[in-house]
Amino acid sequence: MNKETEFFIYLLEKYAEYKKISTTDVLNTLEQFDLTNFIYNMYERYHMEAIENAFKDIDDLIEEKRN
């Protein structure tokens, strides 16, 4: 497994804990709003900063897609 995939799984698990939902629900939401590949491809940015910044970014991206 490559480092991007490992980090993506870690990010999904931590984001699910943060939102108090299942990782399946997180992935389904990302898929619903066509964000899965975008988030996956943000490895270079997300793995270098505080994970809370990634959470905020994901929240903002989902909210933007909802509106």
Pin down the residues of each PLM region:
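Mixed-charge, low-complexity intrinsically disordered regions
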Residues: E4, Y18, N37, E64-R66
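N-terminal acidic leader/helix
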Residues: M1-D25
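Long, compositionally biased
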Residues: E44-N67
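Low-complexity, intrinsically disordered/propeptide-like segments
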Residues: K14-Y15, L30, E64
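Generic alpha-helical secondary structure signal
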Residues: E6, T24, F33, E49-K56
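Amphipathic, hydrophobic secondary-structure cores in small proteins
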Residues: S22-L30, D34-M42
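Charged, low-complexity, helix/coiled-coil-prone segments
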Residues: M1-F7, Y40-I51
